[in-house]
Amino acid sequence: KEGYLMDHEGCKLSCFIRPAGYCGRECAIKKGSEGYCAWPACYCYKLPNHVKVWEYATNRC
């Protein structure tokens, strides 16, 4: 599974003012294989199926 990580409000996890490597660390915490800042939000690859990712259809932000 891949996609944008979400914050506690269900919005994309911002990386706009974060240091280099921030998204990779956040993706690793969620057990993803890798991630990067797809400006302005963190995008992850190979996440476990139980991890919730941002979806356009259910966007509230």
UniProtKB/Swiss-Prot annotation:
Localization per record: Secreted
* CDD domains cross-referenced by the UniProt entry: neurotoxins_LC_scorpion
One Pfam family assigned to this protein is Toxin_3
Q: Which residues carry the post-translational modification Cysteine amide, per the record?
A: 61
Alphabetical list of InterPro entries matching this protein: LCN-type_CS_alpha_beta_dom, Scorpion_toxin-like, Scorpion_toxin-like_sf, Scorpion_toxinL, Scorpion_toxinL/defensin
- Alphabetical keyword list: Amidation, Disulfide bond, Ion channel impairing toxin, Neurotoxin, Secreted, Toxin, Voltage-gated sodium channel impairing toxin
One GO term in the molecular function aspect is:
toxin activity
Q: List the disulfide bonds.
A: 11-61, 15-37, 23-42, 27-44
Write out the tissue specificity statement of the associated record. Expressed by the venom gland.
**What PROSITE patterns has UniProt attached to this entry?**
LCN_CSAB
Would you tell me the Gene Ontology cellular component terms?
extracellular region
Q: Which domain of life is it from?
A: Eukaryota
> Matching SMART domains, A to Z?
Knot1
Q: Which residues form a coiled coil?
A: none
Q: Which residues form the LCN-type CS-alpha/beta domain?
A: 1-61
The answer to whether UniProt assigns keyword Disulfide bond to this entry is yes
Q: Which family does it belong to?
A: Belongs to the long (4 C-C) scorpion toxin superfamily. Sodium channel inhibitor family. Beta subfamily.
Domain-level remarks = Has the structural arrangement of an alpha-helix connected to antiparallel beta-sheets by disulfide bonds (CS-alpha/beta).
Protein name, per record: Beta-toxin Tce4
Q: Which organism is it from?
A: Tityus cerroazul (Scorpion)
